[in-house]
Amino acid sequence: GSEMCIRDSSSAMHGLILLDEEKTPLSRMITWADNRAADEAEKLKYTVLGKEFYRQTGTPIHPMTPLNKIKWLQNSQPELFKKTAYFVGIKDYIFYRLFGELISDYGTASGTGYFDIHEFQWAEEVLDYLNIRIEQLPQVFPSTYQVTGLPSKTAAELGLPNDISFVLGGADGPLSNLGLGAFGDTCLL
């Protein structure tokens, strides 16, 4: 038989995990389905600022996005917001647990509402609005980025060789579109 030598990864978009300085979760993950940020989204949606954020990030102003979840957190749970050292998604956190690196891919980052899809970097104007810094977010790489070198204990627990490569992969939405062939300059479904 052949051995697995590479793993790909994917996750649901729009989730938010709040980490402390030691990168330990401060609460349960806030999933895409959590609508507690509806008021924040509604306040921002039709403003000049909201339209600019949409132009820059390509992400509609909606309660499911981490953009509005963070604003909701500031307004409803300011003490928890102050304790939060890092704002990450589920896949970002899993890669941290596996390899000790906070990293994300462009597709997953694009669903946050604070990633500039034109410059392929975190959107500083949106981060200013949220009162967060780039250092509180994962480093962002193309979906083809590979990480190799599982710690021996982790590799043994997972039954994987420690020299296996993990491909950063993407998020469910962008990968679904890719699988359907819905990409390119002139393709619309």
Regions found by a protein language model. Give the residues of each.
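Residue-level marker for buried hydrophobic side chains located in beta-strands
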Residues: 31, 166-169, 188-189
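Glycine/Thr-rich phosphate-binding loops that ligate phosphate moieties of nucleotide
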Residues: 9-47, 79
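Gly/Ser/Thr-rich active-site cleft segment
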Residues: 52-171
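Short, small-residue-biased leader/transition segments that mark boundaries at the very start
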Residues: 1-6
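"…together with the soluble PPM/PP2C metallo-phosphatase catalytic core" -> "…together
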Residues: 7, 172
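Acyl-thioester C-C bond-transforming condensing/cleaving domain
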Residues: 90, 186-188
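Alpha-helix C-terminal capping segments
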Residues: 179-185
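Short beta-strand scaffold segments in enzyme catalytic cores
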Residues: 15-18, 175-179
